[in-house]
């Protein structure tokens, strides 16, 4: 027969496990939102080049290089957020894709001007790198991003009003002041 202390300990242990699972679920959802933000930004600002977009403790961010020198404004953030909501409503799926020919993918990124993605892929080419594809209901790829994942199965897991773009800040590529200053959009979900 277990003692009261052991029973309480087990309850606490189960609670901690459940909270860790909830935190991981939230991290995956936020990371998926960062991809949706990148997709929205590239639709509205085709000159935008993608750097990185992880989930962080209180939300997520994505770093962009607007090659025409445009600086994101509050009005831009409103438009990006609205486009994100439109993307979410489409019930798009996220699909993991193992890159079969890494050198070819690096060349494609370079041809598209996606120098940051090319640099990251070059660095991780021996790690079985993957893209995450965002697809519509007919299987058409609408967006792809270099990413290890994981992601939510589809955008219906996100409530459109549960995302909020917060601010723009400068961020040096890879945190190195000798590198180019990018624009980081912070958000939460």
Predicted features by range, described:
Residues 1-15:
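N-terminal amphipathic/basic-hydrophobic helices that include classical n-h-c signal peptides
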Residues 2-3, 32-34, 156:
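Generic serine detector
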Residues 54-56:
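Structural signature of FAD isoalloxazine-binding scaffolds in flavoprotein oxidoreductases
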Residues 11-28, 49-52, 61-189:
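Auxiliary tRNA-acceptor-end handling modules of aminoacyl-tRNA synthetases
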Residues 27-45:
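Active/ligand-binding-proximal structured segments within catalytic/core domains
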């Amino acid at each position: 027969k277990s003692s009261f202390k052991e029973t309480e300990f087990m309850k606490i242990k189960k609670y901690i496990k459940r909270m860790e699972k909830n935190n991981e679920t939230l991290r995956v959802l936020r990371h998926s939102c960062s991809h949706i933000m990148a997709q929205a930004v590239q639709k509205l600002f085709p000159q935008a080049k993608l750097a990185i977009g992880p989930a962080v403790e209180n939300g997520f961010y994505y770093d962009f290089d607007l090659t025409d020198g445009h600086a994101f404004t509050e009005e831009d953030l409103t438009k990006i957020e609205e486009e994100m909501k439109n993307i979410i409503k489409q019930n798009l799926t996220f699909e993991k894709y193992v890159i079969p020919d890494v050198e070819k993918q690096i060349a494609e990124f370079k041809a598209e001007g996606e120098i940051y993605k090319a640099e990251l892929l070059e660095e991780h080419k021996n790690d079985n790198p993957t893209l995450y594809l965002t697809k519509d209901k007919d299987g058409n790829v609408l967006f792809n991003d270099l990413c290890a994942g994981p992601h939510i199965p589809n955008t219906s897991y996100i409530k459109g009003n549960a995302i909020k773009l917060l601010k723009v800040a400068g961020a040096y590529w890879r945190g190195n002041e000798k590198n180019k200053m990018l624009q980081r959009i912070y958000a939460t979900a």
